[in-house]
Regions:
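Pocket-lining segment of extracytoplasmic ligand-binding domains
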Residues: 26, 62-155, 160-161
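Short, solvent-exposed amphipathic alpha-helical segments in soluble enzyme
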Residues: 56-58, 104-105, 170-174
């Protein structure tokens, strides 16, 4: 059950891509190449951790085969740049600032999810959808990357009044184009 106690879903916002990032100078080219490597699966109890764990499991990569660490995006990016970790997962809208900044420090490669794993993921939950990160989204990324996407959802506390929630959604949707432009996200 994905429901969060004390909150309710207000609106679907945009699709977040599960981005799997490695250094371009590494020998990691597929998910299977993560075996024996240290991988940031996102902050503890985050959506990124959930997605990363599911992807690795369905690829046959358990915690016995991959050293999984919980790091927030900034820490993971710093450790990938310095070579302290081998890969990071980041579930966010494409053109993610932390990945763009990391690409200025070192050359990167994004990993695609293979068809077999992708089919398993899509069969696992209706929240996942196939997502293509277009070529040239990030510096040095010269080909499309196949991954999964999940819808970002705006949650509101059950304590918020109906009027406040209505005003929030009215403001959000009346400025949806501005939001999409300002954040480089697909609306």
């Amino acid at each position: 059950d994905n429901r969060q106690q004390g909150y309710r879903a207000i609106a679907g916002l945009y699709t977040e891509a599960c981005q799997i990032v490695v250094r371009a100078d590494s020998d990691i080219r597929t998910l299977n190449d993560l075996q024996g490597k240290t991988v940031s699966i996102g902050a503890s109890e985050s959506g990124t951790e959930q997605n990363a764990t599911e992807i690795l499991k369905l690829s046959g990569l358990t915690s016995k085969l991959v050293h999984m660490v919980n790091l927030d995006y900034a820490d993971a990016a710093g450790k990938l740049a310095s070579g302290e970790i081998d890969a990071l997962f980041c579930t966010a809208g494409i053109r993610t600032a932390v990945i763009e900044e990391l690409a200025k420090e070192c050359d990167l490669r994004l990993l695609s999810i293979d068809d077999t794993c992708l089919e398993k993921l899509l069969a696992t939950t209706k929240e996942y959808r196939k997502y293509i990160i277009p070529a040239n989204t990030y510096s040095g990324q010269n080909k499309d990357v196949t991954t999964i996407g999940v819808k970002a959802v705006l949650l509101a506390s059950d304590d918020l009044s109906k009027e406040t929630v209505e005003k929030l959604t009215e403001t959000l949707f009346s400025h949806a184009q501005d939001l999409a432009y300002a954040t480089s996200l697909d609306a």
